[in-house]
Amino acid sequence: MEVLRRSSVFAAEVMEVFDRSPTDKELVSQAKALCRDYINSRLIRAGVSWSKPEHNTPVPGGKLAEVSAILLRLGDELEYIRPNVYRNIARQLNISLHSETVVTDAFLAVAAQIFTAGITWGKVVSLYAVAAGLAVDCVRHAQPAMVHTIVDCLGEFVRKTLVTWLKRRGGWADITKCVVSTDPSLRSHWLVAAVCSFGHFLKAIFFVLLPER
């Protein structure tokens, strides 16, 4: 799908900014590129990719590729621990995938609740896992255009909520510390933080299901 190939347009620019302090706009662009890559990986894994990757389609390289690989690796661990949380997202939220407004509101509600008690890399990984799970649901229900909506929503959430936090850590490359550190407490920290976010995720489901008054 074209939405997943658009990352190639600015791939070189996204990779270049890892060598200096990134701007807000660059961090958001990187977030969306990482989201497309994460979603594409999960679509392929679920066997619901709607088109075969073209041979001439560029893939992320350099540090961006490293960040993407680590994000997917941590996502694998998170989804292994709580597989039911990141599957059938639309059914858990009891939402229609035919309305862009409904999908947008539901995703942003879940995202906001995940980060209610603060920001950690574990929660960031959880956010991407939710986005990918919802994207898989959309494609399975013949709504592939919603993938672009989800990517944009994640980018907007990053802009409003995570950019300052990311800049303090020097950008997305900071996530590599989750796997290269020899301190076991650092590695377990992101897992504990993500597990704690499960409660917020379920709370978000409750709020989304509340009828309007």
UniProtKB/Swiss-Prot annotation:
GO biological process entries: extrinsic apoptotic signaling pathway in absence of ligand; intrinsic apoptotic signaling pathway in response to DNA damage; positive regulation of apoptotic process; release of cytochrome c from mitochondria
List the transmembrane segments: 190-210
What Pfam families does this protein's entry cite?
Bcl-2
Q: Which is a Gene Ontology cellular component entry for this protein?
A: mitochondrial outer membrane
Keyword tags: Apoptosis, Membrane, Transmembrane, Transmembrane helix
**BH1, short sequence motif: residues:** 113-132
Question: In chain numbering, where does the motif BH2 fall?
Answer: 165-179
Query: Does the entry feature the keyword Repressor, yes or no?
Result: no
Give the location of motif BH3 in residue numbers: 67-83
> Which positions does the motif BH4 occupy?
32-44
| Role played | May play a role in apoptosis.
Task: State the name under which the record lists this protein.
Answer: Bcl-2-related ovarian killer protein
